[in-house]
């Protein structure tokens, strides 16, 4: 779970009051958080970086794309608070301002939603950007298509606030952005920027500028091989002919995204009064949430937020022109009876609306249904249950009386679980290594790369990202994704997973069917059809299950080198040699043999 370090004095300043550790621990429950430590300085903070002998905090500066200043030790006379968040769905709480906002509003403080609306655009309202514009190259659509940003003006940045901004950007890029893979952020000196900006796709050979931490210009290739951030994140660009470059109207480079900023426009220092903050990535919702969160944070710190217009050369979910920060969230609904049923007690309407207000959610009551409008910095309401959880947290857990369960049952492992465990032990004995994968993925992984149609794929109604839009119907794509990332390891690779798969089916209770499935893969130059057939034979022999094989025609496998497995007179699985086109789609150069079994169908 995320752990954050925040400067105590800045936190209590934004909270508007001071409180002791016990009180803070109790109030943190509304954020599903715990106070882990409250007595160390920045010198002891392993997450936030260590002090160099010269008394400067250097690690977070080197790690963050958008900063180039160092913070003097004198700014950290007060202690830091280390807080563990028990929820990964609220990146807005990973900042000092975001956490202080929740605790302040939860305690009855006024919401600043009206203050945020002054700079937020939406589908109906477009705020004036006063000529601040970013034009996006059409060629970036398949590389890193989305970008958002804003300008923040105010009093000069203090060392503490600059340090906090660095920490927030790093957490968002590393955790929310999966180490800059889907999202990265940059911060620049706005007073030196000549608008409009161009977010271009350029050849790596055309890139040349002085990056952060360097004193002389480097070529694009040199940045990826010699600069610390290039060596760490250069793999994100290696598969593309063009790389994303952000430049201003004079041709001055702001950043080679998502690697590093330039040493001129990207060198933010203490005392700066105008900042341009941008976020780029592969998922538009994630990019907008990150920008909205940072804009609200800096607004809470007293800075004036000024929008920036983003002009695309291709269609996006919100059109070709989006002025950011942009409010895109959909309203969610939950019925009163659902709240009473899940929370286990009847609640009056006034209590429920108050609970939503304490979680900074706008709510309207319409005929027994609560219509909730999420805050601009949130995008974690996926289901009515999420809204009910907000009511629970808004009321605080102390106001719910514990109840002793009224039923008594004796538990035992199900037959399916016992069979699953036995199969795992057998496969480990056969030399296979167990893997665990996500159940969600993209159509590209589950269909396009596998030469399959999407006819029976289950689609999530409101996915957070395109990468997790569909429920897997087979484990084999997950095994191939692991093989792609394991090409550097010694062969042979023998891996398996036993987990859930789901697909649309007219025979299912809700039009879908969920199965416990076994998937296995063998990758090596010596792998053969006979070897994987022997594995199937040995596995079913140890399970004392007679079986037959029949000719199969699955587009994922080579025709004539695949077979269906039949047990109890029914088709329960398939195995064979993965089709060369599938391997090419996954960029795998080693022959692979794989198979899949419905574990539940093996039960008598």
UniProtKB/Swiss-Prot annotation:
UniProt GO molecular function: ATP binding; magnesium ion binding; phenylalanine-tRNA ligase activity; RNA binding
Superkingdom of source: Bacteria
Protein name (record): Phenylalanine--tRNA ligase beta subunit
Localization annotation: Cytoplasm
Record bears the keyword Aminoacyl-tRNA synthetase: yes
Reaction equations catalysed: tRNA(Phe) + L-phenylalanine + ATP = L-phenylalanyl-tRNA(Phe) + AMP + diphosphate + H(+)
Signal peptide: none
Major localization class: cytoplasm
Subunit architecture: Tetramer of two alpha and two beta subunits.
């Amino acid at each position: 779970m995320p752990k954050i370090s925040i400067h105590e004095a800045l936190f209590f300043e934004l909270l508007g009051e001071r409180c002791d550790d016990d009180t803070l621990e109790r109030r943190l429950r509304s954020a599903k958080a715990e106070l882990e430590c409250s007595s160390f300085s920045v010198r002891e903070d392993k997450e936030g970086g260590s002090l160099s002998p010269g008394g400067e905090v250097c690690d977070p500066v080197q790690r963050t794309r958008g900063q180039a200043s160092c913070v003097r030790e004198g700014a950290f006379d007060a202690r830091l608070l280390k807080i563990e968040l028990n929820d990964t769905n609220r990146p807005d709480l990973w900042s000092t301002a975001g956490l202080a906002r929740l605790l302040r509003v939860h305690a009855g403080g006024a919401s600043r939603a009206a203050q945020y609306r002054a700079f937020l655009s939406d589908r109906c309202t477009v705020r004036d950007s006063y000529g601040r514009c970013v034009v996006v190259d059409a060629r970036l659509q398949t590389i890193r298509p989305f970008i958002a940003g804003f300008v923040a003006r105010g009093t000069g940045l203090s060392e503490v606030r600059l340090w906090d901004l660095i920490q927030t950007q790093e957490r968002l890029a590393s955790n929310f952005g999966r180490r800059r893979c889907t999202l990265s952020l940059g911060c620049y000196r706005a007073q030196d920027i000549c608008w409009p900006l161009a977010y271009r796709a350029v050849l790596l050979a055309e890139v040349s500028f002085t990056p952060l931490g360097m004193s002389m210009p480097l070529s694009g290739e040199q940045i990826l091989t010699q600069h610390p951030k290039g060596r760490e994140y250069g793999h994100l660009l290696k598969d593309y002919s063009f790389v994303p470059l952000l430049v201003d109207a004079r041709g001055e480079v702001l950043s080679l995204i998502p690697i590093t900023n330039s040493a001129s426009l990207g060198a933010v220092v203490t005392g700066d009064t105008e900042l341009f903050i941008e976020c780029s990535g592969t998922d538009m919702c994630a990019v907008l949430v990150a920008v909205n969160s940072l804009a609200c944070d800096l607004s809470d710190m007293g800075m004036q937020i000024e929008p920036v217009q983003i002009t695309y050369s291709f269609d996006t979910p919100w059109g070709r022109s989006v002025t950011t920060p942009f409010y895109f969230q959909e309203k969610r609904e939950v019925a009163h009876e659902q709240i009473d049923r899940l929370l286990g007690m009847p609640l009056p309407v006034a209590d429920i609306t108050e609970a939503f207000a304490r979680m900074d959610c706008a709510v309207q009551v319409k005929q027994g249904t609560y219509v909730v409008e999420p805050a601009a910095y949130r995008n974690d309401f996926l289901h009515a249950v999420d809204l009910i959880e907000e009511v629970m947290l808004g009321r605080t857990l102390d106001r719910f009386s514990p109840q002793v369960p009224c039923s008594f049952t004796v538990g035992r492992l199900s037959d399916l679980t016992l069979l699953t465990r036995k199969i795992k032990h057998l496969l480990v004995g056969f030399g296979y290594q167990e893997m665990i994968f996500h159940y969600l993925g993209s159509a590209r992984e589950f269909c396009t790369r596998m030469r399959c149609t999407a006819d029976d794929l289950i689609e999530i109604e409101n996915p957070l990202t395109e990468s997790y839009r569909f429920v897997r119907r087979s484990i084999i794509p997950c095994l191939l994704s692991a093989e792609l990332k394991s090409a550097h390891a010694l062969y042979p690779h023998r891996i398996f997973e036993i987990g859930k798969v789901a697909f649309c089916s007219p025979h299912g209770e809700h039009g879908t069917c969920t199965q416990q499935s076994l998937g296995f893969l063998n990758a090596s130059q010596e792998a053969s059809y006979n070897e994987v057939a022997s594995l199937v034979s040995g596995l079913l022999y140890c399970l004392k299950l007679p079986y037959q094989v029949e000719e199969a025609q699955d587009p994922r496998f080579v025709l004539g080198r695949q077979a269906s497995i039949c047990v109890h007179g029914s088709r329960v699985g398939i195995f064979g040699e993965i089709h060369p086109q599938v391997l090419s789609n996954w960029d795998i150069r080693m022959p692979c043999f794989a198979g899949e079994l419905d574990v539940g169908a093996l039960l008598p």
